[in-house]
Amino acid sequence: NNMDKIICSNIWKIFGNDEKRILDNLDPNLSRDEVQEKTGHVVAVKDVSFSIQKGETFVVMGLSGSGKSTLVRCLTRLIEPTSGSVIIDDTDITKISRNSLLDLRRNKMSMVFQHFGLFPHRTVLENISYGLEIRGEKKQDRLDKATESLNLVGLKGWHNNYPRELSGGMQQRVGLARAMAVEPEILIFDEPFSALDPLIRREMQDELLDIQKKLQRTMVFITHDFLEAIKMGDHIAIMKDGEISQVG
């Protein structure tokens, strides 16, 4: 289907020092705990397949330890899958070189984590333009894009402030603006709002839904919160013990 932006096929991730061999000899009847007991290896992601259409928000929901954060890091190869393929725009990224991968991360995808990872000694605007700087864009272009991004997330007037002067919710807006500034085709969110208090969390959800209406990016959104999943997702994959039990 030419609408598919991301196709994951049979993704496995096993943690341990001999992951390939363990996978090749895996007894399918053993539970995760039994595998760990017998082999000292942890099956974090178990034979997961799904596809994500261009412009949709695909939510992966599960409790902590379900493998959802590991899975999403396999999409960018921050964690190398033990086996399986991740096809983004017809390219299997598990097969590309380190340089192509960095290029892809720089130009095509952005990640937003729960911990904002802002630079304390940079202003809000400088934080937002960081990705553009790495990419080597001209200063004026950087400022223009960063300012646009800043306004998009409702931080107009805060560009010269420093992260410590902002509340948690506002810091998360800066993180969101930074991800948006590079105009990525794919945005990956790992529990971005779960550290915020409920009211601000709802505000941020609404904000992201508005932004998504305007920009129609492809989004992968991880959460443990059922209500958040329903609110944010076009499709929801439920993950448990490293497997996706259903996609709705």
Task: Describe each PLM feature range.
Residues 76:
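Helix-to-loop junction immediately C-terminal to a conserved catalytic motif
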Residues 162-166, 170:
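Conserved ABC ATPase signature
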Residues 247-248:
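ABC ATPase "signature
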Residues 181-185:
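A short, proline-enriched helix->beta-strand linker immediately N-terminal to the Walker B motif
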Residues 35-40, 94-110, 134, 139-140:
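ABC ATPase NBD coupling module
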Residues 84-92:
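Conserved ABC transporter NBD signature motif
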Residues 24-34, 91-92, 129, 133-136, ...:
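Conserved ABC ATPase "signature" region
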